[in-house]
Amino acid sequence: MQILLANPRGFCAGVDRAISIVERALEIYGAPIYVRHEVVHNRYVVDSLRERGAVFIEEITEVPDGSILIFSAHGVSQAVRAEAKARDLTMLFDATCPLVTKVHMEVARASRRGTEAILIGHAGHPEVEGTMGQYSNPKGGMYLVESPDDVWKLQVKDESNLCFMTQTTLSVDDTSDVIDALRKRFPSIIGPRKDDICYATTNRQEAVRNLAGDADVVLVVGSKNSSNSNRLAELAQRVGKPAYLIDSAADIQEAWLKDAHNIGVTAGASAPDVLVQDVISRLKALGGVNVQEVSGREENIVFEVPKELRVDIKQVD
């Protein structure tokens, strides 16, 4: 049984930055450090940070006065940001992915101009809630669509003054279908200058598509609440291969591997490599004899942490 590893896989620059912000805050200021929402959607990462003193909350009211608060990588609405700034907090750090912030700026610009904005995204996802919450102009409008059907049912105030943007972790193929529907339904609609689906999402989906061609089964390391991890499993299934989303090696069922000669392995953008290595070890124990890295796009993007956290940890008492 051969093990095929997708490239790229695992952590993206935004996730790396968000985790580093929490880790450095803990090292510099000490526990507890409060984080609004899971900093990234991965159970292993969240549990590890919680053990070190991170406290994950959903409401700003849960944060005691004088505390340090961090916004998660998914971003927050203007209302949440204002609520946090009104509190008596020692420090407030923003771990929002810069590529999510880019979409926030697009929405805020539309709001200032009174242009109605349509967001393609999944209802209830924290990134979507934060992005929708950048729009405040009552003369315009902000709408959420998930499918072409939603587009055809949508009613807006002025079809000649519309723009759209997307959640950063969507399926490239599904989003293309929704954008096609938007352009047919609203011919004058204006899209972003550069695709809102982030480089990491696109690259990992492309890697899974390449991997699935040679794999009999695909294992995606990622948590159930991770949007980009779910999209990877769906993509492998769409090209006709059995695919399973797993939090860890312990989730692997031997029955999945029956009669399989090539096992494809990838990881969502919020899944650490240690989990992938555990999966490889588990597969070797089940008969895997060779590990092959499948070539893919190289990634060298790095996002810096806030300047207050750019200190030599060794110098911290």
Curated annotation (Swiss-Prot):
Pathway linked to the protein: Isoprenoid biosynthesis; dimethylallyl diphosphate biosynthesis; dimethylallyl diphosphate from (2E)-4-hydroxy-3-methylbutenyl diphosphate: step 1/1; Isoprenoid biosynthesis; isopentenyl diphosphate biosynthesis via DXP pathway; isopentenyl diphosphate from 1-deoxy-D-xylulose 5-phosphate: step 6/6
Gene: ispH
Chain's role: Catalyzes the conversion of 1-hydroxy-2-methyl-2-(E)-butenyl 4-diphosphate (HMBPP) into a mixture of isopentenyl diphosphate (IPP) and dimethylallyl diphosphate (DMAPP). Acts in the terminal step of the DOXP/MEP pathway for isoprenoid precursor biosynthesis.
Pfam families: LYTB
Cofactor note: Binds 1 [4Fe-4S] cluster per subunit.
Binding site for dimethylallyl diphosphate: H41, H74, H125, S226, S227, N228, S270
Subunit structure: Homodimer.
Residue sites binding [4Fe-4S] cluster per the record: C12, C97, C198
Top EC category: oxidoreductase
Keywords of the record: 4Fe-4S, Iron, Iron-sulfur, Isoprene biosynthesis, Metal-binding, Oxidoreductase
Known catalytic reactions: isopentenyl diphosphate + 2 oxidized [2Fe-2S]-[ferredoxin] + H2O = (2E)-4-hydroxy-3-methylbut-2-enyl diphosphate + 2 reduced [2Fe-2S]-[ferredoxin] + 2 H(+); dimethylallyl diphosphate + 2 oxidized [2Fe-2S]-[ferredoxin] + H2O = (2E)-4-hydroxy-3-methylbut-2-enyl diphosphate + 2 reduced [2Fe-2S]-[ferredoxin] + 2 H(+)
GO process annotations (BP): dimethylallyl diphosphate biosynthetic process; isopentenyl diphosphate biosynthetic process, methylerythritol 4-phosphate pathway; terpenoid biosynthetic process
Family recorded in the similarity comment: Belongs to the IspH family.
NCBIfam families to which the protein is assigned, alphabetical: ispH_lytB, PRK01045.1-2, PRK01045.1-4
Active site: E127 (proton donor)
Protein name: 4-hydroxy-3-methylbut-2-enyl diphosphate reductase
Source domain of life: Bacteria
Chain residues that bind isopentenyl diphosphate: H41, H74, H125, S226, S227, N228, S270
GO MF annotations, alphabetized: 4 iron, 4 sulfur cluster binding; 4-hydroxy-3-methylbut-2-enyl diphosphate reductase activity; metal ion binding
UniProt: (2E)-4-hydroxy-3-methylbut-2-enyl diphosphate binding residues: H41, H74, H125, T168, S226, S227, N228, S270
Enzyme Commission code: 1.17.7.4
Necessary cofactors: [4Fe-4S] cluster
